[in-house]
Amino acid sequence: MKKNKLAVLTSCLVLSGTFCTQAQNKTPQEIRIPDTYKLTNKSIYRNGWIDFNKNGKKDVYEDPMVPIDARVEDLLSQMNVEEKTCQMVTLYGYKRVLKDDLPTSDWKKQLWKDGIGAIDEHLNGFQQWGLPPSDNPYVWPASRHAWALNEVQRFFIEETRLGIPTDFTNEGIRGVESYIATNFPTQLGLGHTWNRNLVHKVGYITGREGRLLGYTNVYAPILDVGRDQRWGRYEEVYGESPYLVAELGIEMAKGMQTDHQVAATSKHYIAYSNNKGGREGMARVDPQMSPREVEMIHVYPWKRVIKEAGILGVMSSYN
């Protein structure tokens, strides 16, 4: 049975790559990886540490043996207002907001010349919502995609003042949002299985594929509790039961973060799924509920997933 499942998965991945290549009307052999950015700071890479701020000495934040809190405090003490501001920003990737697939000399004049908190969905093969797949050559194979993200990372490490790496984020609603990643059922579909082990495996594959593609942070699991079927994103929830959402959310997060593959960032904190009238998108409004309802229904999954799965990120609600 396991061999059959593996064969099916392998076939799906092969077909996914075939469709991706055909959509771009190119074969991997015809795509040349351009040398758009050259390594200019080889001297910053030392034995066991990186001289991120290029000052020739090992600062506290550059020492991997120092406790993380001390490293954070040291880095914050060296950051100016512009650098701190940029670390609060997420930049949407290629064909969404960012016009370049790889770094260019113009990047040193842009907002992110001082670094950027995260780049979301970069080079994942999609453009704006409703548009056909983008034609970038770094979607397939996965090794080329990872190489491209590493090139982007090199810009932030080597060409910004403090060398703060960016966080490569992506959606994980039904697997990694990539043109070549495995496309799982929605969370609502998985919720109907009531199968903890299955959801754990979905989480593991999601984290594994995200890591192999070069992403460091995946937005999942979704811990919204569905109480109004009119809501336009109802398919993203595990169901209407806080207990079910908590149980499956725990397994999804544990699977994703196995062996530190990626950071699991859950969303949306809190009560995002209960807008008045089930409104969503540009018409979204605030939720209306009692404090008891918030605590008993919507806070419950978050308490458990944070404590029992140790998720590494939280996305706030924006209703």
Positions of the model-derived regions?
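Glycoside hydrolase catalytic-domain context in secreted enzymes
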Residues: 19-319
